[in-house]
A protein has these predicted regions:
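Short beta-strand His + acidic residue motifs that chelate non-heme Fe in jelly-roll/DSBH
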Residues: 75-77, 95-96, 119-124
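Short, conserved beta-strand element in jelly-roll/cupin
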Residues: 66-70, 79-95, 134-136
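Bacterial N-terminal signal peptides that target proteins for export
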Residues: 1-10
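Bacterial N-terminal signal peptides
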Residues: 9-18
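Short acidic-glycine-tyrosine-enriched beta hairpin
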Residues: 99-116
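A short, N-terminal "cap"/entry segment at the start of jelly-roll beta-barrel domains
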Residues: 22-61, 142-164
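A short hydrophobic beta-strand segment most commonly corresponding to one strand
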Residues: 126-145
């Protein structure tokens, strides 16, 4: 009888706890409610804009959003302390890690940049490009912005190989 009472008491406590526990919820950021904003010109060459930016609250560290680059626009060199993932959604662009070749990226491509790697990305000279950028903050640091990508570097011949 005692084990049955103990089991019943545990079930009752669990049921009551579920009634008083805060409900888990999701946040939905509706496309129609989000603003398109120009990117910071101190970190980009040319015209680009950000849409649908999001940033998780601590303890989560994820942030991201859509970035649309007009033809010829690009980021400056930069480093993400915990890496960055780009999902190209439209058009064609270019990316490069320091010391590596310039590579073409197209709609459907995914670029995974490891933590601490100096790189840049942007549209091709004659074609727009849009991607979703996803990263993580490290102790309140998202990105270390560096120098502008020169035209000499940006206009290098494209290496036609896989992203890896």
């Amino acid at each position: 009888m005692k084990p049955a009472l103990t089991r019943a008491a545990c079930l009752l406590c669990a049921a009551l706890a579920s009634l008083t526990a805060p409900a888990a919820s999701q946040t939905i950021l509706r496309a129609a409610e989000q603003q398109s904003v120009p990117v910071n010109p101190a970190n980009f060459t040319g015209a680009a804009r950000g849409d649908g930016a999001f940033r998780q609250q601590a303890p989560a560290r994820v942030y991201g959003g859509w970035v649309t680059f007009e033809p010829g626009s690009r980021t400056h060199w930069h480093i993400h302390p915990l890496g960055q993932t780009l999902i190209v959604t439209f058009g064609a662009g270019l990316t490069q890690v320091e010391g590596g070749p310039v590579r073409e990226i197209r709609a459907g491509d995914i670029v995974i940049c490891p933590p601490g790697v100096k790189h840049w990305h942007g549209a091709k000279p004659n074609q727009a490009m849009q991607h979703i950028a996803i990263g993580e903050r490290a102790e309140n640091e998202q990105v270390q912005w560096l120098e502008e990508v020169s035209d000499e570097i940006y206009l290098q011949p494209i290496q036609a190989t896989s992203i890896k």
